[in-house]
UniProtKB/Swiss-Prot annotation:
Transmembrane segments: none
Source organism superkingdom: Bacteria
Protein name per UniProt: Cell division topological specificity factor
Signal peptide segment: none
Keyword Lyase: no
Keyword Glycoprotein on entry: no
Function description: Prevents the cell division inhibition by proteins MinC and MinD at internal division sites while permitting inhibition at polar sites. This ensures cell division at the proper site by restricting the formation of a division septum at the midpoint of the long axis of the cell.
InterPro entries, per database record: MinE, MinE_sf
GN (gene name): minE
Family: Belongs to the MinE family.
Organism field: Prochlorococcus marinus (strain MIT 9301)
Amino acid sequence: MMTLRDLINKLLGRETASANTARERLQLVLAHDRVDMSSLTTDLLDKMRKEILDVVAKYVEIDFEEVAVSLETEDRMTALVANLPIKRTIDGEIKFKKTDKTDKANKDIKK
């Protein structure tokens, strides 16, 4: 939407202030983000959740009562976050690749 100041600046041949340009671009980005997210309906999220659980359940036993799937938005990026507590692998034990991050997790699991 063009303000009176923008109209006068345009008629006088002045450039639009960078703040106004930045604001207009931000509004377009926000509108674009809202449109993209609106396509993720509850039914679609439920279907994705079920399919993810079906695939993971082929390899590990999941604690279905503790499963949490959510959408999280940060810095204009939306992520599907799935917290799937694993009881054990299908063959009976949980195996981890040893890394700094999993080192503590392995110690906690063995307790």
